[in-house]
Amino acid sequence: MASAQLIEQLKNVEATFQELTVRLADPDVATDPAELQRIAKARSSLEATVQTFHEWQKLTRELKQTEELLREVASDDPELEAMARAELEQLRVRQEQLEEKLTLLLLPRDPNDEKNIMLEIRAGTGGEEAALWAADLARMYTRYAEKMGWSVRLASLSEGEMGGYKEAILEIRGDQVYSKLKFEAGVHRVQRVPVTEAQGRVHTSTATVAVMPEVDEVEVVIDPKDIEIKTARSGGAGGQNVNKVETAVDLLHKPTGIRVFCTEERSQLQNRQRAMQILRAKLYEMKLQEQQASISSARRMQVGTGSRSEKIRTYNYKDNRVTDHRLNQNFLLEPILEGELDELIQACIGLYQKELLAELS
């Protein structure tokens, strides 16, 4: 049975939901698009909790009615009693499931969960093979995003000398992108025979993934004096003019040493805007990392640290196996590389929620 504290929390959520519903119908709110969007978003974030609470209330009433029926027929009708007991058991199981779901729905929410992201993939140890592996990861995340109905765009790219990517930044936009992909941050290790390996020996290479929530100018303020910008001729889109006009932008943030090189847009202005967007995301991620480091010193969670240096996964081609070290669980390699990440990601979310519940209790 749900605790009095849980029920009180749910009643407060329900009251807030009803208040937001009333405000949405206010003519004054309807004339303010920004306020209308804010209220609609806040209401939407509570909808699943309220609907589940209503389902729990209905089921609890049914359970009480069944208990009363059981008391009435206990000695008169053995067959009806057996049916009532079976139904009562089913209702109790369902009630327990709903209470567990409601507890999870009331967990503190990450304010970044609904945001779009910049997903950065950098080749790590392993030379040219690491660059090829980084490109494979970029393809994997692109496939996953497409399956989720999200849009993917290459925001920045530095190619390897023999192919692959030294560094790639994907801009991924859609519903709840950060909430799904934030657990992908860390070191991804691959064990396979490189195409350049004549002896058939297995090599180990790595690539590092960073997941940066998209932020606006209000959330991260950058002093123009801290920025140094150089331009260069682009090797990207642009047809015959590609090497005649300096459209590429090389941006340096002097206080942190962060450098962003953008060539993917057609004009210098667009590349400059894109570089600033990436810089803001990188600075915000640094702030998140600092916050997470202070939290991690107080608790040690298997998932959710988001550290670039944490080895989270090994992809073993010989055994057709992917091992997630946080979950201590194996998955088939080929579906994962084709973007079938949902089972793995949901498992990470489940573990994170379980650890958060344990910490709160």
From Swiss-Prot:
What Pfam families does the entry give?
Answer: PCRF, RF-1
UniProt modification remark: Methylated by PrmC. Methylation increases the termination efficiency of RF1.
Question: In this chain, where does the modification N5-methylglutamine occur?
Answer: Q240
Any one Gene Ontology MF annotation carried by this entry is: translation release factor activity, codon specific
**Does this UniProt record's set of keywords contain Oxidoreductase?**
no
Similarity annotation: Belongs to the prokaryotic/mitochondrial release factor family.
Q: What is this protein called?
A: Peptide chain release factor 1
Q: What is the lineage of its organism?
A: Bacteria, Bacillati, Cyanobacteriota, Cyanophyceae, Synechococcales
Tell me what gene encodes this.
prfA
